[in-house]
Design a protein with these regions (language model features):
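Aromatic-rich, lipid-facing transmembrane alpha helices and their immediate juxtamembrane interface loops
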Residues: 1-160
């Protein structure tokens, strides 16, 4: 699975013409979000709002952390491109779409694969999942921007 996401990262990096600094920023963004994901999973599990069928062993959590880094990095290369093209308005749209479609995706996955994930009934678990997707975009993009710099400062800005 990590190999597939690594290939996806390479393809997105090529298609977005990402520099080494941007790729590094995307990986740092993924690393920050990996910690957020692990913390949120633990909190949702403790509240009884969500159960993910994972083993809470350190080795498995380390693998999940590495997977989330490689899985999120292409997303931040894309959000960087959106910010470059559409500015903060484009990022707000991406965040809103993620906040709506993220819970839809997770509810679909819970209905289709109940052995992998179960979500408690009610509004608050869905709101928490939406907030998690929003936090993933905001935290990851902010971390990437701290490493790679603002998208408007890109030397390829006018070369689309």
């Amino acid at each position: 699975m990590v190999g597939g996401y690594t290939v996806a990262l390479a393809v997105v990096a090529y298609l977005t013409r990402a520099t080494g600094r941007r790729i590094g920023g995307a990986v740092v963004g993924g690393a920050c979000v990996g910690l957020v994901v692990l913390a949120v999973l633990w909190v949702l599990e403790a509240l009884g709002w969500c159960h993910v069928g994972i083993t809470w062993a350190p080795a498995f959590l380390s693998l999940l952390y590495v997977l989330s880094i490689v899985w999120c990095a292409p997303l931040y290369l894309l959000t960087w491109r959106v910010a470059r093209r559409f500015g903060w308005v484009g990022l707000v749209v991406v965040v809103c779409v993620a906040g709506v479609l993220g819970p839809v995706h997770d509810l679909w996955a819970a209905a289709r694969f109940p052995q992998w994930i179960t979500i408690a009934p009610g509004l608050w678990p869905v709101v928490a999942i939406g907030a998690t997707y929003i936090a993933e975009i905001v935290v990851g993009h902010a971390a990437m921007r701290m490493v790679a710099g603002a998208s408007r400062a890109d030397p390829l800005r006018g070369a689309s």
